[in-house]
UniProtKB/Swiss-Prot annotation:
Signal peptide limits: none
Enzyme Commission number(s) of this protein: 2.7.7.48, 3.6.4.13
Record protein name field: RNA replication protein
One GO MF term: ATP binding
Length: 162
């Protein structure tokens, strides 16, 4: 197998390169498809289409993927490292961001995390009313609660641009 084990030299970079090569060998990736890779994790904003030619070599490749397909509708977007891959761009998963902020409040670490959490939230906040197109009612409630908490804490800027 090509994939490297955790703790070995350039594990992350090697795993990322292998994941990209494997994915593009197995699937037809249309031009304009948004793709994210990190180590052995990946996501894309469209449903992968298996290349017929992959069946000819599949039994000779030890690397196997753990595939999860999402319908790319509110509540069912592909996720990647805590981010939802939506038609409007990436947004931090509202429930996870809310839970992380609540934990920070509980352990007294809000001063250390509020700016980073505001930066994470900014991707969704900047969508304005369009955010309602990509969130479920529950996700919208978590988003609103996180915005409210961060505004109440003060000193945060949701208009941050990466």
């Amino acid at each position: 197998a090509i994939m490297r084990m955790s703790g070995e030299g350039p594990t992350f970079d090697a795993n990322t390169e292998c994941a990209i090569a494997y994915h593009h060998t197995k699937y037809q990736v249309e031009q304009g498809t948004a793709q994210l890779y990190a180590g052995d994790d990946m996501a894309q904003d469209t449903t992968p289409i298996l290349k017929p030619s992959f069946r000819l070599i599949a039994d000779r490749i030890e690397l196997k993927s753990k595939e999860v397909t999402h319908t790319q509708v509110p509540g069912e977007y592909a996720t990647f490292c805590g981010w939802c891959v939506t038609p409007k761009g990436i947004i931090k998963e509202p429930r996870k961001l809310f839970a992380s902020l609540q934990l920070a409040k509980h352990i007294g670490k809000t001063a250390e995390v509020k700016t980073n959490y505001a930066h994470d939230l900014a991707h969704a906040y900047r969508l304005g009313d369009e955010l309602q197109d990509v969130l479920t009612p529950d996700e919208a409630a978590f988003h609103q609660a996180t915005v409210r908490d961060l505004v109440t804490m003060g000193g945060v800027d949701f208009q941050w641009h990466p």
